[in-house]
């Protein structure tokens, strides 16, 4: 489990991995993400939820946290979980219940971000986490164009359109730091039989954000593979494939991503994996 608490001007975070429950990593950092507007998609469950907890510990007073997911109830529960941190650090939290595969959902997310587009913000952090598993079937079964388009609309197109929309709301200017995170997978790099939809979307997203890194030198872009986590998606994978993997608690990959963002020394466009950094 990952915990964080503020002590004077330092933020401490703890990572527990050992089977006996004792922490094997302890670190303290005065660093923050600045006065930031942070947008997390797929925030209501699993990795996105863990990221919301991690990120909120490192935001300066007056920062804005925009949490996007389909379930309004789960988002409100998350907001309540974060209340002690957000009140202490005077954060503004918006919960957007939206389907990002639709124009309406994307437009609402951009609209809320636009209303927070004030000059005092010095860091824009967009974490494209929302994704789905899709149909695990043989390549030759995908003859329904609507099924394929629907999957790619949510898992690929939406992250392109949302990122472009937020870039337009917060154009690069002196003093503004821009970071885009693409939550990726080892299957963006490795083909797996029967996973054509998932592998295609993850690989295309990696290339899409590589293009962004080439086009926008002032935007720091990271594709991050968090590994197999204890999430509903991974449980679906185990149920469908019968393959049982040891699953990571979501807090561990979330904490490692936060360290990468705070260190900020990765090359833009990099694909980094939880197990190799």
In which residue ranges do the predicted regions lie?
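Conserved glycine-rich cofactor-binding loop
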Residues: 44-45
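Non-catalytic terminal and boundary segments that flank Rossmann-like NAD(P)-dependent oxidoreductase
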Residues: 1-39
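C-terminal helical subdomain
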Residues: 219, 223-225, 231, 236-277
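Rossmann-fold cofactor-recognition segment
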Residues: 82-104
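Conserved NAD(P)H cofactor-binding loop of Rossmann-fold oxidoreductase domains
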Residues: 127-137
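Conserved glycine-rich Rossmann-like NAD(P)H-binding loop of the short-chain dehydrogenase/reductase
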Residues: 60-78
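Catalytic loop of short-chain dehydrogenase/reductase
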Residues: 132-133, 143-145, 151-152, 157-161, ...
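The beta1-alpha1 cofactor-binding region of Rossmann-like NAD(H)/NADP(H)-dependent oxidoreductases
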Residues: 72-73, 97-111
């Amino acid at each position: 489990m990952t915990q964080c608490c503020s002590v004077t001007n330092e933020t401490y975070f703890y990572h527990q991995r050992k089977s006996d429950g004792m922490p094997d990593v302890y670190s303290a950092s005065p660093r923050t993400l600045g006065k930031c507007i942070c947008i997390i998609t797929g925030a209501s469950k699993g990795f996105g939820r863990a990221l919301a907890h991690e990120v909120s510990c490192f935001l300066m007073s007056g920062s804005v946290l925009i949490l996007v997911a389909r379930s309004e109830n789960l988002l409100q529960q998350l907001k309540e979980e974060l209340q002690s941190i957000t009140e202490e650090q005077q954060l503004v939290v918006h919960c957007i219940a939206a389907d990002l595969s639709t124009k309406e959902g994307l437009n609402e997310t951009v609209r809320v971000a636009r209303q927070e587009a004030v000059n005092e913000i010095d860091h824009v952090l967009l974490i494209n986490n929302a994704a789905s598993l899709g149909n695990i079937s043989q390549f030759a079964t995908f003859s329904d164009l609507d099924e394929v388009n629907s999957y790619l609309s949510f898992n690929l197109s939406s992250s392109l359109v949302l990122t472009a929309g937020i870039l337009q709301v917060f154009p690069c200017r002196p003093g503004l730091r821009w970071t885009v995170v693409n939550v990726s997978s080892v299957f963006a790099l490795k083909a797996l039989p029967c996973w054509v939809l998932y592998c295609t979307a993850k690989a295309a997203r990696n290339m899409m954000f590589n293009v962004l890194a080439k086009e926008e030198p002032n935007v720091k872009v990271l594709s991050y593979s968090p590994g197999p986590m204890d999430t509903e998606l991974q449980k679906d994978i185990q149920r469908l494939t019968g393959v049982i993997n040891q699953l990571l608690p979501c807090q561990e990959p979330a904490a490692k991503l936060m360290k990468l963002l705070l260190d900020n020394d990765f090359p833009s466009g990099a694909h980094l994996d939880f197990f190799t950094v």
